[in-house]
Swiss-Prot record:
This is Protein BRASSINAZOLE-RESISTANT 1. Residues 102-121 have a biased composition (Polar residues). It comes from the Eukaryota. Residues 1-41, 102-151 are annotated as: Disordered. Residues 1-20, 122-140 have a biased composition (Low complexity). Induction: By brassinosteroid (BR). Up-regulated in response to abscisic acid (ABA) via epigenetic regulation on repressive histone marks (H3K27me3) mediated by JMJ30 and JMJ32. It comes from Arabidopsis thaliana (Mouse-ear cress). GO terms for molecular function: DNA binding; DNA-binding transcription factor activity. Residues 232-252 are annotated as: PEST-like. One of its GO terms (biological process) is seed development. Phosphorylation by BIN2 increases protein degradation and/or interferes with the nuclear localization. The lineage of its organism: Eukaryota, Viridiplantae, Streptophyta, Embryophyta, Tracheophyta. The keyword Transcription regulation applies. Disruption phenotype: In bzr1-1D, weak dwarf phenotype with reduced hypocotyl and petiole lengths and dark green curled leaves when light-grown. Increased cell elongation in the dark. Hypersensitive to brassinosteroid (BR).
Length: 336
């Protein structure tokens, strides 16, 4: 008796302990569960009413969600058996496949990826970023490829590309920052700026100017008509004028003439112009021709290198001495 009473007492104590271990929901939690269930049933009743009225579904009065799912599958062309086995019409699975778990993938299951799915890998993935970071190797130049249709340019297959060139990797991604292992990341090529470009252009211009054997002088007076066959006058450019008037209206033009290189420079070859004062004067020496030219008196013709030189229209060849000039203040009379 004692043993039986002890056993019953211990069983009652264990049941009481198990009941005490389970947490009893509060009144508020029970009320929330009831309200949630009522809302779910009200929504389901409205769905069933709409399907019966407008969808011609044969649903019982008190049905659950399984009945609705079965009716939808039948409308879509699927077969739903009493045990829940679902399949397309004419494609009943084998008994071995039906005996599997519910998560078993069947040939006609909705979990099977279709060939047109976006998750299906394409031959050339568009999401690869670079050969080093991509798990799919890009086509290279050195890899053999026997499929002519997969080559974009079939004429480059045999002998079109020399084998001495390094392997070319093709990437369909946007330009990205090179990895640390890339040689371009350690020694990046400096970007050119305007200052370096200007210095390089000036150096090239100086080298090209130094290659000429003839110096350039700036003259503001046009060349003589008799000397046009000796010196070529290039196209003129406007002279720099700091006045308010326009250079086009002022008519001031500057031209560059090329004079023959002579050692030493003669005074007759250097143009007598105010603009020439801006150029560093060359060492001048008197030549026999210059001395003979200064000794010639006033005449309409003179000899130059044993030949008669005639003036052009409107020109008078004469020498004016400094002692023959006098500054007059409006009286117009020269010294007697």
């Amino acid at each position: 008796m004692t043993s039986d009473g002890a056993t019953s007492t211990s069983a009652a104590a264990a049941a009481a302990a198990a009941a005490a271990a389970r947490r009893k929901p509060s009144w508020r939690e029970r009320e929330n569960n009831r309200r949630r269930e009522r809302r779910r049933r009200a929504v389901a009743a409205k769905i069933y009413t709409g399907l019966r009225a407008q969808g011609d579904y044969n649903l019982p009065k008190h049905c659950d969600n399984n009945e609705v799912l079965k009716a939808l599958c039948v409308e879509a062309g699927w077969v739903v058996e009493e045990d829940g086995t679902t399949y397309r019409k004419g494609c009943k699975p084998l008994p071995g496949e039906i005996a599997g778990t519910s998560s078993r993938v069947t040939p006609y299951s909705s979990q099977n990826q279709s060939p047109l799915s976006s998750a299906f890998q394409s031959p050339i993935p568009s999401y690869q970023v670079s050969p080093s970071s991509s798990s799919f190797p890009s086509p290279s130049r050195g890899e053999p490829n026997n499929n002519m249709s997969s080559t974009f340019f079939p004429f480059l297959r045999n002998g079109g590309i020399p084998s001495s060139l390094p392997s070319l990797r093709i990437s369909n991604s946007c330009p990205v920052t090179p990895p640390v292992s890339s040689p371009t990341s350690k020694n990046p090529k400096p970007l050119p700026n305007w200052e370096s470009i200007a210095k390089q252009s000036m150096a090239i211009a100086k080298q090209s100017m130094a290659s000429f054997n003839y110096p350039f002088y700036a003259v503001s007076a046009p060349a003589s008509p008799t000397h046009r066959h000796q010196f070529h006058t290039p196209a003129t450019i406007p002279e720099c004028d700091e006045s308010d008037s326009s250079t086009v209206d002022s008519g001031h033009w500057i031209s560059f003439q090329k004079f023959a290189q002579q050692q030493p420079f003669s005074a007759s070859m250097v143009p007598t112009s105010p603009t020439f004062n801006l150029v560093k004067p060359a060492p001048q020496q008197m030549s026999p021709n210059t001395a003979a030219f200064q000794e010639i008196g006033q005449s309409s013709e003179f000899k130059f290198e044993n030949s008669q030189v005639k003036p052009w229209e409107g020109e008078r060849i004469h020498d004016v001495g400094m002692e023959d000039l006098e500054l007059t203040l409006g009286n117009g009379k020269a010294r007697g």
